[in-house]
């Protein structure tokens, strides 16, 4: 039997260093992230795909890459399947809107990212309200509602944040949020 001439403290420090490095490389699981005090998460239901999602997208002032990728896929163009890159500030806006409302219900997503072809098709179908240079095509806009919360309350909460555009569409039953200039319609 070989005897190690390393001091027990050095052995311990070596193991501890390997664990710290492994922890930095291996991301925490979603439940572990959600338990962190500064975790920011979203709960979403997609009205067109039927998908549901609960995801941590940021902890403190850092975005969580896996959370952002998951959200990008969830908010893909549901007509074409194309996945866009969503502005992380849009997730902050959603998080703060829900916090302002003091509710825990998920957002119902009507529209997230749109490719140019989908945007053109929607403009040409006569539904109205689809901008030629829509921020949906840049991943900077989302159309949402919250079950059981009046649309006007969702609009007012988002407007109070002064963080981007807020469109109110009561006939179509959604509120548009974007990370463009502060404006309301």
Model-predicted regions and their roles:
Residues 1-23:
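N-terminal secretory signal peptides and thylakoid transit peptides that target proteins
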Residues 55-56, 121-123, 156:
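Short, solvent-exposed loop/turn and secondary-structure capping segments
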Residues 106-120:
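Acidic helix-start/capping segments at beta-turn-to-alpha-helix junctions
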Residues 60-110:
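Active-site acidic/histidine clusters and adjacent loop/turn architecture
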Residues 2-3, 34-35, 40-45, 126-185:
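Catalytic cores and adjacent binding grooves of peptidoglycan-active enzymes
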Residues 26-55:
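C-terminal segment of N-terminal export signals and the immediately downstream linker at the start
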Residues 91-95, 119, 151, 155:
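Extracytoplasmic/secreted envelope proteins and their assembly/folding machinery
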Residues 93-98, 115-118, 137, 144:
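Cysteine-centered nucleophilic/redox motifs
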